[in-house]
Design a protein with these regions (language model features):
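Acidic-and-aromatic substrate-binding clefts and catalytic sites of carbohydrate-active enzymes
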Residues: 20-22, 110-118, 144-147, 152
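Mid-to-C-terminal alpha-helical segments outside catalytic/metal-binding sites
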Residues: 186-229
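Short acidic/histidine-rich active-site segments
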Residues: 137-138, 165-188
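A metal-dependent hydrolase metal-coordination microenvironment
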Residues: 1-25, 41, 46, 53-76
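Histidine/acidic residue-rich metal-binding segments in metalloenzymes
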Residues: 24-33, 55-103, 116-131, 152-168
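Non-cysteine beta-strand/loop elements that form the S-adenosyl-L-methionine
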Residues: 37-44, 105, 130-136, 170-172
C-alpha cells in the first residue's frame, strides 16, 4: 500500500504446487527467505502434501502427515496456504490444521459450473467462517462447462461468491499465466473491463477495493502478523 501511494507497482510472488518443497520441510523456509507470500499446496494431481481435485488417486485421503507439517511451517513463517487445486477432503483437512486464514487464489463456484476444480457453497461458507478469501478465476472451463464464458459469467461467479461468503471474502485471481482469459478479459490490459462491469452494477469504491486485492492483503497481513507473535 505504501508503494501504491508512492505511485509504484508491487508484485506478490507465490508457488503453485507444493511439489517444489520436495520432501524437505526446510525448503518452506528457503522459499520464504526468497520472498514467497503463498504456496498452492498441490496442482493437477496428488503430491507429497495432499490430494488434488483433479486426476487424484486418493493417495493420502486428504492432507498427508508431511502436508500437516508443511501447513504448520507456513503458519510459523507467515505464508498463506492456498487451497485452489486441492481436493475436497484436503480442503477441509487444511482448514482444520491451519491456525491462520486460508485462500483459494483462483477457484470458482461449483454450483454454477459443476467441475471438481471449483468449490461448493459449503466450502465457501467454511472458508469465509475461517476468515479466508476465494478469488474468482477467468479460466473458461471453470466459468462454464461449455467453455464459452463471457464477462457476464465471471460476474455471476463473483456475485454468487458474495452472496454465499460476503464481500469481505472474495476477489479476482485471473490465472492469465495458466490459460486464464475470456473475451474482453484476455489479459491484464483488459482488466479495466471488469471494473467497468462492477461500476455498472453500482459497486462502491470500498467494495471494489476489497475485490481488487483488499481482501487478499488482509489475509496476507494476518498471516504475517501471526508469524511475528
Amino acid at each position: 500500500l505504501r508503494n501504491k501511494r508512492n505511485g509504484l507497482r508491487s508484485l506478490l510472488t507465490g508457488i503453485e504446487n507444493g511439489l517444489a518443497i520436495e520432501n524437505d520441510i526446510s525448503n518452506v523456509q528457503h522459499f520464504a527467505n526468497r520472498g514467497i507470500t503463498y504456496i498452492t499446496l498441490c496442482h493437477n494431481g496428488d503430491n507429497q502434501i495432499c490430494d488434488s481435485a483433479r486426476h487424484s488417486l486418493n493417495t493420502h485421503g486428504g492432507v498427508s502427515p508431511f502436508g500437516a507439517q508443511v501447513i504448520a511451517e507456513m503458519n510459523r513463517l507467515g505464508l498463506m496456504v492456498d487451497l485452489s487445486h486441492a481436493g475436497e477432503k484436503s480442503f477441509y483437512d487444511a482448514l482444520q490444521i491451519s491456525r491462520t486464514p486460508i485462500v483459494c487464489s483462483h477457484s470458482n463456484s461449483r454450483a454454477l459450473c459443476d467441475v471438481p476444480r471449483n468449490i461448493t457453497d459449503e466450502q465457501m461458507r467454511a472458508l469465509a467462517a475461517a476468515g479466508g478469501v476465494c478469488q474468482i478465476t477467468l479460466y473458461n472451463g471453470f466459468l462454464r462447462t461449455d467453455g464459452n464464458a463471457t464477462i457476464t459469467d465471471a460476474i455471476r461467479h463473483l456475485e454468487h461468491a458474495i452472496d454465499i461468503m460476503g464481500i469481505e471474502h472474495v476477489g479476482l485471481g485471473a490465472d492469465f499465466d495458466g490459460d486464464g482469459g475470456i473475451p474482453g478479459l484476455a489479459d491484464a490490459s483488459e482488466l479495466v473491463n471488469f471494473t467497468k462491469a462492477l461500476l455498472r452494477r453500482r459497486y462502491s469504491e470500498t467494495d471494489m477495493s476489497l475485490i481488487w486485492g483488499g481482501n487478499w492483503l488482509r489475509v496476507m497481513n494476518l498471516c504475517q502478523q501471526s508469524a511475528q507473535r
